[in-house]
Amino acid sequence: MISLSFQPVDGTEEIAIQDLIQDKSQLVAGNTAGTSDQIQVWDGSKFTVYFYRAKKTTNPKFLIGPCWVDANNAGVKTLDTIKHGAGVWFARPSSAPAQAQITISGSVSALPFNHTVNPGFNMIASAFPVDMPLNTMQVGDVTQTCPIDWVSCGAVAGNTAGTSDQIQVWDGSKFSVYFYRAKKTTNPKFLIGPCWVDANNAGVKTPAIVPAGKGFWYARPDGKDAGTLIQASPIAQ
């Protein structure tokens, strides 16, 4: 899962699918979704799948490539866009020769960015090209600062993963799941919240960081209100 951490250089909030990856030399192009690199975009309820279509020479109708196409309309070069601050899946076919170095470029705003989160799963990312600590805390000799004030932004805190906001980060083979833990007053051991904790080690405030360039799932429990997460810019004046 990768992130759209830059704005287009013209200052707009959306980037064309065709322009998302500037260096296309490492992309795998094919004539089906299964043989091509894919970009998968979540809209809150379903994925839209795009694949990098090669030029098909046996039918003039399909002399459109290589370019990105919607898997449901593969004869037409897509004009769809993705919003800055989103996360997307980038999927490679199993036959791909090697890892690709994906480069996304643009401008960095000095203004804060607002992430809208709804009940259910939201695919988002840091809106800026920097690491994003989940908690502000001291780690050894380093003070790491989270760019989001979770309390003022209304993050949903609970004492189980199912009753709390979650952040789920994919490492290439599995998800690391974190949830926003509330203060638990019945046991002094757990007077740690509200803060983000690893679901596998929920008694300890996590030093976890979402790496620059990586998207993630932000899951809000059903029945809770939608909200806005305000992320500070690293170059704010």
Residues covered by each model-derived region:
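Intrinsically disordered, low-complexity segments enriched in Gly and acidic/Ser/Thr residues
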Residues: 127, 131-201
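A cross-kingdom feature marking solvent-exposed beta-strand/loop segments within repeated
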Residues: 46-84, 174-212
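Ser/Thr/Pro-rich low-complexity tandem-repeat tracts
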Residues: 25, 35-36, 45-48, 164, ...
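Fold-core signature of tandem repeat domains
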Residues: 39-41, 50, 90, 167-170, ...
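A short, polar beta-strand/turn micro-motif
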Residues: 1-35, 43, 79-158, 208-237
